[in-house]
C-alpha cells in the first residue's frame, strides 16, 4: 500500500477569524486532506471548525509573539514525531516557522503568499520574515501581481506557482421568496442594491467610494443604495481600518446618508448567498496603495459564483479576479468617475448571470486544491 503524503500546515488565519485568508486556509486544508494526511497548527478556537479529515492543534491567538512561539514549538514537535513530507505556511507570517521545522525532518518547505505578505512596511518583518521567502522550496502566490512582487523580493521564478483562491459554487439559485423576504427585512424592496462584502479596511476604500462615486450614482439612479456586510477587523495584522461610523459620517457629508445601510458581519453562508443574489452590483472599490496591495479579491469570485457582477479598479490581483466585460467592469486605478460609470452601466445594462457564473466555475475549490497539490510536488 502506497504511503500517503503528509502535509503540515502552520497558519494564524482560520475560522472563527473572519476574512478571505481565513476561508482560503480552511479550504486549503480541506482540499489537501482529500489527497494527503493533513495536520494543522492553528489559532485558538479553530479546532471546533476544522475540516473533518484534518487533525488540528491550537496555539494562543494573542499576543502575536506567543502565537508564533507556541506554533513553532508545536511544529517542531510534529516535524520530529510525525515526519511530514511538506510543511506549508498559510501566509508569510508563518513562513519562518515552516522553514525552521522542515530542517528537523527533511521536509520540503512552502508558503502560500498574498501581496501584503511581501510588501508590508514593517522593519522587523522585512529584516527577519521576508528573507525566509527565498529560502523556501516552494512559493505559491494568489495572483499574477503577487508573483511579480515575489520575484522583486528575490524569490527565484522557478520556485513560484500561481494558484488562484477558490470559491464554493452554489448548487442552485436561492428561492425567490427568501430573496424577497431578505429585501423586505432590511427595507430594500425596489432598491438598486450595491453590495459591499468584507472587512472595512483602509485598502478596501469604501469611505472614498461613498465620497467620490456614490453621489453621482445616486443622482443618476435615485434608488441606489450601498449595502455593507462586514465590519472593521479586530484581529487582523497590519490593516488600517475604516469604521462604519466614519463611513456613515462621510455619507452624511456627501448628502447620501440615506443611501447606505450596514448589516454587520454575516457568518451564515445561506444568508450571505441570498444577499449576493438579491443585489444588483458588487462594488469593490479597492484603492491602489503600493505598500498595501490587494493580493487577489476572493469576494469578487464569490459574487460571480452567484451571478453578481463586480465594479472595481485595476489594482493588485483584482485583475485576475474580475474579467472586464465578462464578470464585471474594471476602471483605471483610483478613477472614481470611471468606476461610477461602470456601476451605472451594470445597473442599466446587466451582464447575464450565466456568463458571470461561467467565469466563476474555473475557480472551484477543487481546482484550487489540485493546484496547491501540484505546486507542492
Model-identified regions with their sequence ranges:
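Short His-centered aromatic/hydrophobic patch
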Residues: 89-95
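Conserved acidic donor-binding segment of nucleotide-sugar-dependent glycosyltransferases
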Residues: 323-325, 329-336, 343-350
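Nucleotide-activated donor-binding/catalytic signature segment of Leloir-type glycosyltransferases, i.e.
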Residues: 230, 239-266, 270
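Short hydrophobic beta-strand element within catalytic cores of glycosyltransferases
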Residues: 300-305, 309-312, 322
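A charged, aromatic-enriched C-terminal amphipathic alpha-helix characteristic of glycosyltransferases
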Residues: 35, 334, 348-377
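Conserved donor-binding/catalytic core segment of Leloir-type glycosyltransferases
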Residues: 8-10, 188-204, 210, 214-215, ...
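Acidic donor-binding loop of glycosyltransferase active sites
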Residues: 259, 265, 277-292, 308
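A short, active-site helix/loop in glycosyltransferases that binds the activated sugar's phosphate group
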Residues: 136-159, 167-172
Amino acid at each position: 500500500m502506497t504511503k500517503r503524503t503528509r502535509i503540515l500546515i502552520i497558519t494564524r488565519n482560520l475560522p472563527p477569524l473572519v476574512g478571505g485568508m481565513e476561508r482560503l486556509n480552511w479550504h486549503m486544508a480541506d482540499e489537501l486532506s482529500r489527497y494527503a494526511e493533513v495536520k494543522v497548527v492553528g489559532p485558538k478556537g479553530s479546532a471546533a471548525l476544522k475540516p473533518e479529515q484534518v487533525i488540528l492543534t491550537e496555539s494562543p491567538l494573542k499576543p502575536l509573539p506567543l502565537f508564533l512561539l507556541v506554533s513553532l514549538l508545536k511544529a517542531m514537535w510534529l516535524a520530529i514525531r510525525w515526519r511530514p513530507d511538506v510543511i506549508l505556511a498559510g501566509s508569510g507570517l508563518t513562513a519562518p516557522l515552516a522553514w525552521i521545522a522542515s530542517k528537523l525532518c527533511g521536509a520540503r518547505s512552502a508558503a502560500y503568499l498574498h501581496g501584503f505578505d511581501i510588501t508590508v512596511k514593517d522593519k522587523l518583518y522585512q529584516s527577519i520574515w521576508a528573507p525566509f521567502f527565498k529560502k523556501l522550496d516552494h512559493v505559491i502566490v494568489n495572483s499574477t501581481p503577487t508573483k511579480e512582487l515575489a520575484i522583486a523580493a528575490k524569490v527565484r521564478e522557478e520556485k513560484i506557482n500561481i494558484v488562484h483562491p477558490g470559491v464554493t459554487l452554489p448548487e442552485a439559485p436561492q428561492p425567490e421568496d427568501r430573496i424577497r423576504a431578505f429585501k423586505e427585512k432590511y427595507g430594500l424592496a425596489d432598491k438598486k442594491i450595491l453590495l459591499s462584502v468584507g472587512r472595512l479596511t483602509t485598502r478596501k476604500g469604501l469611505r472614498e467610494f461613498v465620497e467620490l462615486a456614490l453621489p453621482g450614482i445616486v443622482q443618476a439612479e435615485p434608488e441606489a443604495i450601498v449595502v455593507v456586510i462586514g465590519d472593521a477587523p479586530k484581529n487582523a495584522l497590519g490593516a488600517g481600518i475604516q469604521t462604519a461610523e466614519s463611513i456613515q459620517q462621510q455619507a452624511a457629508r456627501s448628502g447620501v446618508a440615506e443611501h447606505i445601510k450596514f448589516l454587520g458581519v454575516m457568518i451564515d453562508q445561506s444568508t450571505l448567498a441570498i444577499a449576493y443574489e438579491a443585489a444588483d452590483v458588487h462594488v469593490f472599490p479597492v484603492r491602489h496603495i503600493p505598500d498595501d496591495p490587494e493580493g487577489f479579491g476572493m469576494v469578487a469570485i464569490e459574487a460571480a459564483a452567484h451571478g453578481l457582477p463586480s465594479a472595481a479598479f485595476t489594482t493588485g490581483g483584482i485583475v485576475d479576479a474580475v474579467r472586464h466585460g465578462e464578470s464585471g467592469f474594471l476602471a483605471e486605478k483610483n478613477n472614481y468617475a470611471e468606476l461610477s460609470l461602470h456601476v451605472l452601466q451594470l445597473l442599466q445594462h446587466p451582464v447575464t448571470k450565466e456568463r458571470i457564473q461561467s467565469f466563476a466555475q474555473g475557480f472551484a475549490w477543487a481546482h484550487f486544491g489540485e493546484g496547491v497539490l501540484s505546486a507542492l510536488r
